[in-house]
């Protein structure tokens, strides 16, 4: 590679795709050299001079490293939209998060953020329901939603699974979902589970007067089977489908979104496996990028972390993810490696806080996230001393206390389910 793509005087065009990277050059490699190689490898260049790359082509398509901060190990690169297949997340990632992550010239390289131009945003559907659509679907306009995951993760029969879901709904949950590793195992077949659970969700609706949503996991070995499962849910009268976004893959997600409008289903995104490339702060891809791609493709709600639960994620990171889900215009934040993003009218996603939560954490969750969040509890409901139904009731009671500005201890004086939760989970 002979070209120099450092261009400090370049002002990105409205049609450029902008990426921010964290770069740590290998021993003996200077920062500018590493940035140049990274920019070239992610676009038009190779490891050596290539005769087939004409000066005219290079001038038109070359990347521009327009910002470098060696002390912060940060660079920003502007790429012409001509380099990308419009409407294709896999192709974008093959460029800006592909071979470059394996280059010897860097010890570590991380894609921190991508800012998409409006010309590229227009090629994507975005969420079909989005935050406001989910509120309309559930009939809940003025509070966080309460959800649960059927526990144990796997092992229950379809009948027992549906029973656990029913008790969760009856106790006050708005949403009940499968866990990420429950799909179509012998002990709990997809179609039977979906049919039984949706019937009991309907029963709970008639008993409580509230809408009850079952989020059945349609993750499958093939896109064809995934779509078949989605259509089964449609025929059964479901309102939702759930997908494991990273194991399923970006092509599967785009395929699912293309078919979701006809099915009329909201799409719940479980982010399991994301840490394989997001957790290392020096290498891979940030969770911020994953969240943006989910909104771009058109998932309706996404797990983003909790701050207070069992999953990794600092408060500033989780709040950056929240903002990327819900804001129409995301401001730049250099301290958090967030690029400005105008979402061009694509609907917001509903953020989901899930992982190691108990009812006693609801006041903190409400303080952190406000009203626009789905609070999702697993063991925090099913490990309640009085059972699943009481665990769900305790969550609703804790939420009611938070909405009214009353302490949990005060509210628990007249709510025995919450009192039992406090006795079990609240640290003395």
Swiss-Prot record:
Cofactor note: Binds 1 Mg(2+) ion per subunit.
Keyword Metal-binding attributed: yes
Keyword Lyase among record annotations: yes
Binding site for substrate: 153, 271, 303, 354-356, 376-379
Entry EC number(s): 4.1.1.39
Catalytic residue list: 151, 270
N6-carboxylysine: modified positions: 177
GO annotation, biological process: AMP catabolic process; carbon fixation
SUPFAM superfamilies in UniProt: RuBisCo, C-terminal domain, RuBisCO, large subunit, small (N-terminal) domain
UniProt catalytic activity: 2 (2R)-3-phosphoglycerate + 2 H(+) = D-ribulose 1,5-bisphosphate + CO2 + H2O; D-ribulose 1,5-bisphosphate + O2 = 2-phosphoglycolate + (2R)-3-phosphoglycerate + 2 H(+)
Site feature location: Transition state stabilizer: 310
Gene3D superfamilies: Ribulose bisphosphate carboxylase, large subunit, C-terminal domain, RuBisCO large subunit, N-terminal domain
One Gene Ontology MF term: oxidoreductase activity
Residues binding Mg(2+), per UniProt: 177, 179-180
Cofactor(s) this protein cannot do without: Mg(2+)
Record key words, sorted: Carbon dioxide fixation, Lyase, Magnesium, Metal-binding, Oxidoreductase
Quaternary structure, from the entry: Homodimer or homodecamer. In contrast to form I RuBisCO, the form III RuBisCO is composed solely of large subunits.
Family: Belongs to the RuBisCO large chain family. Type III subfamily.
Note: Because the Archaea possessing a type III RuBisCO are all anaerobic, it is most likely that only the carboxylase activity of RuBisCO, and not the competitive oxygenase activity (by which RuBP reacts with O(2) to form one molecule of 3-phosphoglycerate and one molecule of 2-phosphoglycolate), is biologically relevant in these strains.
Free-text function comment from the UniProt entry: Catalyzes the addition of molecular CO(2) and H(2)O to ribulose 1,5-bisphosphate (RuBP), generating two molecules of 3-phosphoglycerate (3-PGA). Functions in an archaeal AMP degradation pathway, together with AMP phosphorylase and R15P isomerase.
Protein's recorded name: Ribulose bisphosphate carboxylase
Gene: rbcL
């Amino acid at each position: 590679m002979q070209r120099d793509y450092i261009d400090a005087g370049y002002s990105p065009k409205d049609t450029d795709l902008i990426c921010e990277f964290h770069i740590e050059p290998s021993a003996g490699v200077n920062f500018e050299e590493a940035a140049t190689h990274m920019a070239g490898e992610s676009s038009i260049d190779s490891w050596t001079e290539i005769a087939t790359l004409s000066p005219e082509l290079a001038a038109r398509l070359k990347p521009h490293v327009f910002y470098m901060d060696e002390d912060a190990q940060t660079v920003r690169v502007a790429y012409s939209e001509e380099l990308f297949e419009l409407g294709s997340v896999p192709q974008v990632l093959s460029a800006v998060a592909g071979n470059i992550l394996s280059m010897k010239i860097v010890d570590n390289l991380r894609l921190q953020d991508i800012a998409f131009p409006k010309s590229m945003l227009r090629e994507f559907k975005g969420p079909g329901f989005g935050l406001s659509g989910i509120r309309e679907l559930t009939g809940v306009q003025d509070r966080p939603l309460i959800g649960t995951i059927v526990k144990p993760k796997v092992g229950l029969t379809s009948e027992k699974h549906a029973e656990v879901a029913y008790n969760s709904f009856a106790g006050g949950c708005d949403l009940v979902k499968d866990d990420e590793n429950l799909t179509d195992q012998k002990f709990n077949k997809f179609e039977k589970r979906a049919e039984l659970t949706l019937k009991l969700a309907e029963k709970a609706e008639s008993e409580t007067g509230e809408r009850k949503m079952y989020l059945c996991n349609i993750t499958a070995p093939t896109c064809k089977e995934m779509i078949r499962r989605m259509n089964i849910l449609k025929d059964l009268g479901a309102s939702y489908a759930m997908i494991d976004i990273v194991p399923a893959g970006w092509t599967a997600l785009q395929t699912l979104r293309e078919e979701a409008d006809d099915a009329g289903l909201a799409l719940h995104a479980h982010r399991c496996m994301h840490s394989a490339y997001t957790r290392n702060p020096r290498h891979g891809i940030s969770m911020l990028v994953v969240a943006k791609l989910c909104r771009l493709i058109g998932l309706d709600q996404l797990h983003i972390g909790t701050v207070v639960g069992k999953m990794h994620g600092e408060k500033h990171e989780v709040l950056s993810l929240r903002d990327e889900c819900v804001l129409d215009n995301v401001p730049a934040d250099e301290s958090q490696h967030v690029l400005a993003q105008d979402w061009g009218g694509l609907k917001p996603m509903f953020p989901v806080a899930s992982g190691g939560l108990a009812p006693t954490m609801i006041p903190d969750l409400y303080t952190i996230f406000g009203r626009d969040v789905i609070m999702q509890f697993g063991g925090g409901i099913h490990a309640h001393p009085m059972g699943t139904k009481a665990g769900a009731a305790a969550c609703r009671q804790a939420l009611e206390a938070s909405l009214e500005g009353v302490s949990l201890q005060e509210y628990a004086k007249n709510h025995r389910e919450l009192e039992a939760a406090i006795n079990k989970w609240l640290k003395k």
